[in-house]
Structures are given as structure tokens and as C-alpha cells.
């Protein structure tokens, strides 16, 4: 009996020693640097895995060399012949054939955000096709799902340096039916994206406000409606159905977010932090000061509160331009990461053709969006950076290297909008541009050996 007890105790002690050693080994594995690569908006329409240009292949190696590579997937992976486009008030319906997920995987992308205004471009069939194809190639995601609980939950990817999490939301969803809704015991929720509902107001100077009031009053009079006799001094706002104007001393976009949505997202960040080593938070937002390349006030405040809630890296997507980099409480905030892929869809819906004043039977693949939309002539949408963010063994920010890229708009349509590493003066120009728009945040960026280095 004594021998059996002694044997049992020996087995228990050996087991404890084994598990302690195993746990120690695992902790050592996580007590190492963690490298995150991040890219911005990805609108991909053509295969890229066949490209042999070293400027592209070296960029791909940067993504593959990171512990985790993140991207904003601003398209649907969907066979458009098997479904139909959703009705949209603005923007063409964006899609890529299911092989797009394989191209992402080939590039080394591990984690994607789906909370944006294109995820639902082919309605629920398109959404579920995108989710299925990402699952098929084992790319993790956040920001969309079968209901609001699934759309709002973090996505996790396991890495050799520990798990990374993603929380993704969108404040730009013109079609409210693209938003996911809650399920309850008696009815399933609506599939869709993870929203931040907002109320938009345009602040204008007194002169513009007076002109707007006069125009509104004249329209109402012409329609035979009763016009309230009020002096401009007596009113603070004007409502034009979907638009609201308020008086001020300058022009500014004011966005008021739904506080319940914000609290829901902060809660998701805290959950992600408990279950992962590094937490990435992304927002998709189109409102902002495009002239000065600055986010609206609520977004800047939101990004900092996300850091306070546990985010290690905050990224805004949507403006399709490179805006400023801020370091807040030792964590990076990219106020807009610009484009990574910006390819035109090979087919768009009939409504989109009509919106551009084109015959609905136009199927010319050589048609350039530049011919129908001045926006595409903006040089800022054709260049950006790929940041490589390194956290040390204690999860403190150690290093940020900014690799400048360009998406050559003068290439043939099948090669346009593909990222290439920039070199020489082009590289310097991109980094100097980012340095300029990051100055208000007291972020010091140095151009050195073809890349940007952030002084920490």
C-alpha cells in the first residue's frame, strides 16, 4: 500500500514538473517580440500571385514575415453570376471572384476587417460567400456576421508569438439594412456589419447659414407651404431632411456617434484583451477634413478611448488617403492608412452604369474610372505606407517602420491599383508627406535608407 502511495505521489510530482516545464516553455514562446504588419483598404479585382516584379514580391515578403498581417477587405468574395447586387444609394457594387481569398492567403494576410460599406454589396449571399471563402483559406475576420453578436465579436489569430485579436466597426453605412441586428429568443437578427450609428451636422459660417435659410424659405413659399417667420438670430439649426446645418465661425463636419454602440465596442475590446496578447481595433469612416487630412473630432476621441480600453493598435480605413500617425499612451493610431489595393471592378451593376451616365450594357474592361469620376485623379489615393509595428516581450511599443508604397495609376487597367514598394525620391516624398500630416500629433518620423522610422 505504501509503495502504491509512493508511486502515486511520484507520478503526481512528475506530472506537475512536466506541466510546469511545458507552461514555462509556452510562456517563453510568448515572451518574445511580436511583429504586426498592417495594410489599408483592399479593393482587389485581378489575380496578383503571378506577378514577378521584385517591388511587389518584396512587399509580399514583408507581410509573410510578420507574426500577423492585417488588411481591410473592402470587397466581397463572390461569384456574381450566382446572386444579385444589393441596391445602393452611392458607390458601385464591389466584388472579386472567390479566388480573391486565395490571393490574400498567398500574400500572407492573416486577419481582415469586414466592417465597411462594401461587405454587403451583394446582399446576404455575398456576405456569407465572403465568410465561407475566408474560412476555407483560414483567414480570420471581424466586423460582419450572421447577427450583431457575431459581427461585433473579436476575431482571433494564433501566432508563434501569441494570439492577436481584431475588433472592427464601421461608421459609414449609408444603407441601414447593411447593419447587423441583435437576435433574441423569438427571432433571429439580421446579418450584416458591426455599426456605429451617427448623426451628421454641417457647421457653416453665418453668411452661408443665412443663404441656406433664405433658399429653404423660398422653396417652401414656392410650394405654397407656411414659412415660419423667424430671424436668423432666433434659430441655431436648419434641417434639410437627411442633412442638418448649424451656425459657427468656420466650416466643419460634426458627427455625433451613438453612445450605446461605442460602449458595445469598448466591451468587445476588453474581451479581446483578456483573450489575446495584441488587440487591433479598426473603424471604417468616410467623414473627415480631407483638406487638412484630419479625422472628425469624435473619431479622434474614439481612437484614444479604444486605446484606453485595451487596444494596442488603432487603424482607420475609408478615406482612401494617408493621414496622420499619432502615438497615444505608447500605442499607434493611424488616422487613415490609405489604399493597399485600389482596382476597379471588372463588372458593376446596371444602377452603377446609370449613375455614371453610361449605357447599362457597357462591358468594356478597358473603361477607366478616371474617365467618369474626377476623384480617381487625386494622387493621394495612389500612395500610402505599410507599417511594420513591433512590440517587445512586455507588449510595449518597440519600433515602427513605414514602408512607402505606390499604386501606379498610369499602368494598364489590369496592373493599375496594385501596390509596389516605392524607391528613391518617390519613397522620400511619401514619407515626408506622412511626416507633415503627423506633425499636429507631435509624431517625429525620419526618412532613412528608403523607409520611415518613427522616433519613440
Predicted regions located by residue number:
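Bacterial N-terminal signal peptides
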Residues: 11-21
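Bacterial N-terminal signal peptides that target proteins for export
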Residues: 2-12
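Membrane-interface motif at the C-terminal end of an N-terminal transmembrane signal
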Residues: 23-25
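Acidic, metal/ion-coordinating pockets
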Residues: 27-456
Amino acid at each position: 500500500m505504501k509503495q502504491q502511495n509512493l508511486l502515486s505521489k511520484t507520478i503526481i510530482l512528475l506530472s506537475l514538473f512536466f506541466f510546469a516545464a511545458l507552461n514555462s516553455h509556452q510562456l517563453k514562446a510568448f515572451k518574445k517580440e511580436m511583429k504586426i504588419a498592417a495594410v489599408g483598404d483592399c479593393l482587389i479585382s485581378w489575380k496578383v500571385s503571378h506577378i514577378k516584379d521584385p517591388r511587389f514580391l518584396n512587399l509580399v515578403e514583408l507581410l509573410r514575415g510578420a507574426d500577423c498581417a492585417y488588411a481591410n477587405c473592402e470587397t466581397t468574395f463572390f461569384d456574381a453570376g450566382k446572386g444579385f447586387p444589393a441596391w445602393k444609394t452611392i458607390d458601385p457594387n464591389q466584388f472579386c471572384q472567390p479566388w480573391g481569398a486565395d490571393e490574400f492567403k498567398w500574400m500572407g494576410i492573416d486577419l481582415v476587417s469586414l466592417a465597411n460599406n462594401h461587405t454587403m454589396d451583394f446582399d446576404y449571399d455575398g456576405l456569407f460567400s465572403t465568410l465561407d471563402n475566408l474560412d476555407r483559406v483560414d483567414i480570420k475576420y471581424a466586423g460582419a456576421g450572421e447577427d450583431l453578436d457575431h459581427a461585433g465579436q473579436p476575431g482571433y489569430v494564433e501566432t508563434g508569438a501569441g494570439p492577436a485579436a481584431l475588433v472592427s466597426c464601421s461608421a459609414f453605412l449609408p444603407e441601414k439594412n447593411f447593419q447587423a441586428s441583435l437576435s433574441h429568443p423569438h427571432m433571429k437578427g439580421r446579418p450584416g456589419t458591426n455599426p456605429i450609428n451617427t448623426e451628421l451636422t454641417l457647421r457653416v459660417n453665418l453668411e452661408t447659414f443665412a443663404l441656406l435659410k433664405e433658399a429653404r424659405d423660398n422653396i417652401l413659399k414656392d410650394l405654397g407651404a407656411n414659412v415660419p417667420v423667424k430671424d436668423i438670430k432666433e434659430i441655431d439649426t436648419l434641417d434639410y431632411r437627411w442633412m442638418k446645418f448649424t451656425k459657427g465661425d468656420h466650416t466643419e463636419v460634426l458627427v455625433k456617434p451613438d453612445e450605446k454602440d461605442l460602449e458595445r465596442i469598448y466591451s468587445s475590446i476588453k474581451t479581446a484583451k483578456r483573450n489575446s496578447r495584441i488587440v487591433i481595433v479598426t473603424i471604417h469612416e468616410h467623414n473627415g477634413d480631407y483638406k487638412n487630412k484630419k479625422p472628425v473630432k469624435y473619431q479622434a476621441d474614439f481612437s484614444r478611448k479604444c486605446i484606453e480600453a485595451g487596444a494596442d493598435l488603432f487603424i482607420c480605413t475609408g478615406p482612401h488617403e494617408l493621414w496622420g500617425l499619432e502615438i497615444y499612451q505608447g500605442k499607434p493610431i493611424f488616422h487613415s492608412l490609405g489604399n493597399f489595393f485600389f482596382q476597379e471592378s471588372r463588372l458593376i451593376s446596371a444602377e452603377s452604369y446609370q449613375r455614371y451616365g453610361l449605357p447599362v450594357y457597357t462591358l468594356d474592361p478597358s473603361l477607366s474610372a478616371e474617365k467618369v469620376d474626377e476623384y480617381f485623379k487625386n494622387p493621394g489615393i495612389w500612395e500610402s505606407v505599410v507599417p511594420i509595428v513591433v512590440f517587445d516581450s512586455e507588449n510595449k511599443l518597440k519600433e515602427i517602420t513605414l514602408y512607402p508604397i505606390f499604386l501606379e495609376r498610369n499602368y494598364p487597367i489590369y496592373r493599375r491599383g496594385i501596390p509596389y514598394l516605392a524607391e528613391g525620391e518617390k519613397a522620400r516624398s511619401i514619407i515626408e508627406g506622412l511626416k507633415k500630416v503627423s506633425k499636429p500629433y507631435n509624431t517625429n518620423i525620419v526618412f532613412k535608407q528608403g523607409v520611415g522610422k518613427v522616433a519613440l
